[in-house]
Amino acid sequence: MVTYISFIGESQFNFYFASKKFFRLTKYFRDPINSKKFENLIKQAIIRKLPHIVNYISMIIKNNKPEFNNKLFDNLGINEYFRQCVKHNIYNAIDYFVSKDINTVNEYGKTPLITAIKSGNCIMVKKLIDYGADFNKNKIYKLAFDHRHNDIFIFLIDKKIESDKTYNKIRNNFGSICNTNINELVESK
């Protein structure tokens, strides 16, 4: 069964959903840009763990209504939505939010990576680091260790060792290139 629902707001969107859970969200259609945190459509979809709805709303906003995008995400801040996706394991929605700054810090000093570590979500930690989240802070390792998330702690240590090896290779190779060039320069004079 195909259901089309539209809501009245600053823009008129048509949504297609084949989910009965979706109908619980219809009360939030009246004001999709409501500044109250828990009366926001996308926030409710995230909290209720409806990734197909989050993805669909994000896709429509991203592709069709950039001006609506700014109004929707500026009220709570992109980091709040991102943190909620991390907290509720909505992996697919991360692609939308990655286009924003992945290392943004909310008013409590938390980044999405910190939220993923605290929730023990190793898959999300890996995705965030793959997308460029900064993991080179001592606080990150201590946080994983303190919360007893061994899999995350081991992953972070392995990633750190890997990045240090890469850094050392680059530094050592650059140094040997410099030495070669200096010797050539000295010999040429």
Swiss-Prot record:
The keyword Metal-binding does not apply. SMART domains: ANK. ANK repeats lie at residues 108-137. Keywords: ANK repeat. The keyword Plastid does not apply. Signal peptide: none annotated. This is Putative ankyrin repeat protein L38. It comes from Acanthamoeba polyphaga mimivirus.
